[in-house]
Amino acid sequence: ADGKTLLATDHPNTSGGTFSNKLAVAADLSEASIEDLCIQIMQATDDRGNLINLMPKSLHVAPANWFEATRILNTTLQVGTANNDISAIRHLGIFPDGVKLNHYFTSPKAWFVRTNISKGKGLIFLQREAMSFERDNDFSTKNALALGYERYSCGIVDPRAIYGTE
């Protein structure tokens, strides 16, 4: 971790300089803003400035954007226009894992794109201790007692795993 927020315009590179995993100007979910963020992802570089094969994998939205995201990704033509142009997002299959709805985003307009960064090098979930259960009875009241215990940790190794806007 580099000490920055998950989405930042100034994540430090190990060899100097910075990179961004956030749109320069915050934008609502739209065909154009998705295309802009996908271009930013596909032009990503490693810590030495070399282009890497980073591609969008899935679109993550809050409930307020669920229907708009579905329209944008599933229409055969451009969204909300009289143009007869194809929907490049659908035609190219930009999001092979589709749209993911997250009920817990703190902003109703939040949306993010998860990338194909190597497993274990992006967003990580570590299960430190597996779920265990214990059961007992309270002697004086005869009430059943139950205890569930689990330990885990979440983090990020490389912020290039997720791009988005605020």
Where are these regions (language model features)?
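Short, glycine/acidic-rich hinge or "gate" loops at secondary-structure transitions
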Residues: 1-9
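Sequence/fold signature of self-assembling virion shell proteins
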Residues: 16-43, 53-58, 64-166
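Catalytic micro-motifs at enzyme active sites that drive phosphoryl/nucleotidyl and oxygen chemistry
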Residues: 46
